[in-house]
């Protein structure tokens, strides 16, 4: 066999081998690229799902925060309204007519004053209270003035027992007892 033919045959086999390797490499590269593309798509899909979940969680959290803030604002407004109602009630009690005031003071003294007690009232009610002490023939002394919207404080001589029967205290007690009813009437 001549050398040219052998060289030609080797060259031909080499070219076929190169072609075969190139085809296998191209197939392998295509396979790797397809797998990489599929993996990238899967990673992208998972990242997108995670981002959507995170966005949804943030949205829910923001909605929850807004709802909480709205509820807080509503409660603040309701509290302000209840305080205004309480202040109006105090004002109404402070401004009650003298006849009604006298009846209430008389009732408080009759039912609660014990012999030897000291009675305190607001300056504006001093004359009425002194008059009632005489009228009811109570064995008590008038002790002076206190800062309140009305009513009396009764104290034993030693100062150990003190009955706060001021309108301030009575209004507060009634208001606290009726607060849920007032709230229902105003806000339901």
Curated annotation (Swiss-Prot):
**Quaternary assembly:** Has multiple subunits with at least A(3), B(3), C, D, E, F, H, I and proteolipid K(x).
User: What protein am I looking at?
Assistant: A-type ATP synthase subunit E
User: Which lineage is the organism of this entry classified under, starting from the top rank?
Assistant: Archaea, Methanobacteriati, Methanobacteriota, Archaeoglobi, Archaeoglobales
* Bilayer disposition of the protein: Peripheral membrane protein
The protein's matches in NCBIfam families, at most eight in alphabetical order, are given as: PRK02292.1 (NF002629)
> So what does this one do?
Component of the A-type ATP synthase that produces ATP from ADP in the presence of a proton gradient across the membrane.
Quote the Gene3D superfamilies the UniProt record gives: ATP synthase, E subunit, C-terminal (3.30.2320.30), F1F0 ATP synthase subunit B, membrane domain (1.20.5.620)
Per the record, GO CC terms?
plasma membrane; proton-transporting two-sector ATPase complex, catalytic domain
Name the SUPFAM superfamilies on file: V-type ATPase subunit E-like
């Amino acid at each position: 066999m001549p050398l040219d033919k052998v060289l030609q045959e080797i060259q031909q086999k080499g070219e076929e081998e190169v072609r075969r390797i190139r085809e296998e490499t191209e197939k392998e590269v295509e396979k790797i690229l397809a797998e990489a593309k599929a993996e990238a798509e899967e990673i992208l899909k998972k990242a997108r799902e995670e981002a959507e979940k995170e966005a949804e969680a943030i949205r829910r959290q923001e909605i929850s925060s807004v709802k909480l803030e709205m509820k807080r604002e509503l409660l603040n407004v309701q509290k302000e309204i209840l305080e205004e109602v309480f202040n109006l009630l105090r004002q109404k009690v402070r401004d009650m007519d003298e006849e009604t005031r006298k009846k209430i003071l008389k009732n408080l003294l009759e039912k609660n004053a014990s012999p030897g007690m000291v009675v305190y009232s607001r300056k504006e009610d001093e004359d009425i209270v002194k008059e009632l002490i005489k009228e009811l023939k109570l064995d008590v002394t008038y002790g002076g003035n206190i800062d309140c919207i009305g009513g009396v404080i009764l104290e034993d001589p030693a100062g150990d027992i003190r009955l706060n029967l001021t309108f301030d205290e009575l209004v507060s007690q009634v208001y606290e007892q009726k607060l849920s009813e007032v709230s229902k009437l105003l806000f339901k």
